[in-house]
Amino acid sequence: MESILEDEIRFKSELKKSISKMNFNYSKKPLVYISHPFLTHGSPEDNLNSVSNVLSDLVLRYKDQFIFISPIHNFGTLDGKLNYEDGLKICLDLLERCDGIIMCGDYIHSNGCMKEMELAVKKGLQIWKLEDFK
């Protein structure tokens, strides 16, 4: 029993040393959240295709200025596995870590997008419409 405990202590100590030696080179580019309807107006597949096009266009055009993140790509596979409120909470948790938000698609009629915009306003994040990037 003691050898297992000693092994665990040794492992944690070595892990701590290796992490402290790592040279993390974090990007200074703003992290921008792509807000797009998922279940509103159209099928999830149609909305995934739409936001996929938006994401690839933005990354190809602005890869040197921004890092873009799409909650639909991160969490879309959880549709039907989480209730709406829990799914939205996960998206809002991600948005909390971002520097800005881009409102896309028919966001005005999407409850989720409007909640995301509400949080962005509350946090003082930069808010853009997709048209601002054209």
Spans of features found by a protein language model:
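Conserved catalytic or regulatory cores that recognize and/or transform ribose-phosphate-containing ligands
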Residues: M1-K134
